Amino acid sequence: MAINNTGSRRLLVTLTALFAALCGLYLLIGGGWLVAIGGSWYYPIAGLVMLGVAWMLWRSKRAALWLYAALLLGTMIWGVWEVGFDFWALTPRSDILVFFGIWLILPFVWRRLVIPASGAVAALVVALLISGGILTWAGFNDPQEINGTLSADATPAEAISPVADQDWPAYGRNQEGQRFSPLKQINADNVHNLKEAWVFRTGDVKQPNDPGEITNEVTPIKVGDTLYLCTAHQRLFALDAASGKEKWHYDPELKTNESFQHVTCRGVSYHEAKAETASPEVMADCPRRIILPVNDGRLIAINAENGKLCETFANKGVLNLQSNMPDTKPGLYEPTSPPIITDKTIVMAGSVTDNFSTRETSGVIRGFDVNTGELLWAFDPGAKDPNAIPSDEHTFTFNSPNSWAPAAYDAKLDLVYLPMGVTTPDIWGGNRTPEQERYASSILALNATTGKLAWSYQTVHHDLWDMDLPAQPTLADITVNGQKVPVIYAPAKTGNIFVLDRRNGELVVPAPEKPVPQGAAKGDYVTPTQPFSELSFRPTKDLSGADMWGATMFDQLVCRVMFHQMRYEGIFTPPSEQGTLVFPGNLGMFEWGGISVDPNREVAIANPMALPFVSKLIPRGPGNPMEQPKDAKGTGTESGIQPQYGVPYGVTLNPFLSPFGLPCKQPAWGYISALDLKTNEVVWKKRIGTPQDSMPFPMPVPVPFNMGMPMLGGPISTAGNVLFIAATADNYLRAYNMSNGEKLWQGRLPAGGQATPMTYEVNGKQYVVISAGGHGSFGTKMGDYIVAYALPDDVK
């Protein structure tokens, strides 16, 4: 039969064949490279088949459709074999192929293929229907979900430190960090009626001198009829809790520069003085006070009634936290979390700049008189004598491990529990002293009155991955073998949740030591084992090429090539010059949001993440000096190139992303989940978050694709069987049924909600409040909003 070579007919066939040929060449060449470094054979085989399809299309043979149908079905079989019926994992393997298959069965396309082949069109239609059926089934049957139901049984727990039901007077509602409210006016039956009650705008936005890492992470506190909150620049606001109207504000006039690694404030602390322990001058000056940490190294006491400085505290209300520090340059020491407040003591820790040099300021923990600001004690984790008080001739220790996340406090035991970070530089540790290693990445229990060590437990030995304890620990009394045990839950970046008796630091849930990958960079070492808690969200298997992802099979192929080029032998693979895949990544499976524990039901709500990072050590050379230049400043971010002056390597730290900027690991990257704390089992786990606000173009309507997004911020839970969480990279506050994880409601936020919400009652009405100000390095929309939600008056 003669081929009709009319211009329009031939052009369409030629373009179709050209597309197939280009796809085939890409898959063949890229796939050959992948096979050469140990990856899957699928891609070069698919490339050869695609080139065969292109040749047949060029020859106008309808048999191309038969061959393409075989490729499509083979791809679906291979995809299910690699990843199961996981919709988001199957999508990049099949999306381009399905769309091209649909193109080929369009009448104006296949009719131009004038050399017939019996049943070719029907074969491709069947292949497309089978592929569509597999994807549809996968879309409604998520293999990553766990679908159980928590017991509703609840026994009222004795409060460790009583808090009025209607209040939220501390960062985690109580200083035990439970993030649980006994309020139940808003409950699982009526939360779908929740409406915006009021919005307050702080006016605090990014300034020209700010670094990229400016973040709005505050959880407000509420005492009586007033809400207290700080902004990214630590401006303090007092709002009417019912209307959201400003009562007063205080501006510490923070002066930042681009070297600050953080510009943020997670919260403030509240103290009410008692006449039996405070002087008459204190009682007259500031009986109720707000304690405000400021990123330049100040701690400020402000009258809770009127916003004026407490004149009897420290230097007319301002305490200099840089006193006796070994390096006082602004931005190197940054208190970003609210301190613990006892009847006598303010327990203050702070953040230090990560990965800058071996001559950084100290991570010392200090106790100050809550009324006067006088230094009562110090615990310098890197000093030979941690409790030694410095003088004008003797400073605190360079590069002591720091505790940057909020701490927890047991008033009955008078113990404060601090989640510790690692000695910086973080990613190479060959020169660390035994003192610097001793308490790094540990839970540290100190007597809050004296600063003396009660006990410590190390969660990562010789930490080379920045696997700090990043979250406020949570204290609760939990039933173990029929007996109530006072425990502490410490979520770690590794995904482990370490559970210890908070009286003595003994493990309640086993955490056996297990072998980990060996082979550190030159001059460094790796410990042979690490502890692995049996209560954990850490990955159940190591990553493989099959876990790589992308928008299409083409960038997925690039991710697979990158994966096989890096060093990766599972969790705790040592940093390397080759580049090491770090999973869980530097953001961790847990971050500063922590977990929420209902002490009555003995259940916990958690929101773990799963986003790999890549660390690559950079040997010293031109442009990468070992000695710190005199004018050197911080990088203003925790990612990218970090100098690590004083050790043999700089380092680059970045998320593991595709050429399109998408995570190279397949979704989910974020979950919401519930734990039964009596059995230590994950009862339910769901993906949380959509790509709506991560798209390259605005999406004015909700996107129904629940992928499971990265997040920063934590959950809260209530006696109404409802949990609330924002945190995700899309701008929503969501409510879930605590018992089974069913999403009950979501409210659109005007900016990123990378904060933990809180709830309270005033004038008989329950409110839920969230900061919606965005997160600079997370890339969410920036703003200055505080948003409150409540039920309409006619809803009960």
UniProtKB/Swiss-Prot annotation:
Query: Does this UniProt record's set of keywords contain Membrane?
Result: yes
Question: What subcellular locations does the record give?
Answer: Cell inner membrane
E.C. number(s) listed in UniProt? 1.1.5.2
Report the membrane topology from the UniProt record.
Multi-pass membrane protein
Q: Mind listing the GO molecular function terms for this protein?
A: magnesium ion binding; pyrroloquinoline quinone binding; quinoprotein glucose dehydrogenase activity; ubiquinone binding
Annotated PROSITE patterns: BACTERIAL_PQQ_1, BACTERIAL_PQQ_2
Q: What does the record list as GO biological process?
A: non-phosphorylated glucose catabolic process
Organism superkingdom: Bacteria
Q: What class of enzyme is it?
A: oxidoreductase
Q: Which residues lie on this side of the membrane: Periplasmic?
A: 38-40, 82-95, 142-796
Q: Which InterPro entries match?
A: PQQ_b-propeller_rpt (IPR018391), PQQ_mDH (IPR017511), PQQ_rpt_dom (IPR002372), Quinoprotein_ADH-like_sf (IPR011047), Quinoprotein_DH_CS (IPR001479)
Which chemical reaction does it catalyze? a ubiquinone + D-glucose = D-glucono-1,5-lactone + a ubiquinol
NCBIfam families recorded for this chain? PQQ_membr_DH (TIGR03074)
Indicate the quaternary assembly. Monomer.
Identify its protein family.
Belongs to the bacterial PQQ dehydrogenase family.
What PANTHER family has UniProt attached to this entry?
QUINOPROTEIN ALCOHOL DEHYDROGENASE (CYTOCHROME C) (PTHR32303), QUINOPROTEIN GLUCOSE DEHYDROGENASE (PTHR32303:SF4)
Q: What is this protein called?
A: Quinoprotein glucose dehydrogenase
Upper classification of the source organism reads: Bacteria, Pseudomonadati, Pseudomonadota, Gammaproteobacteria, Enterobacterales
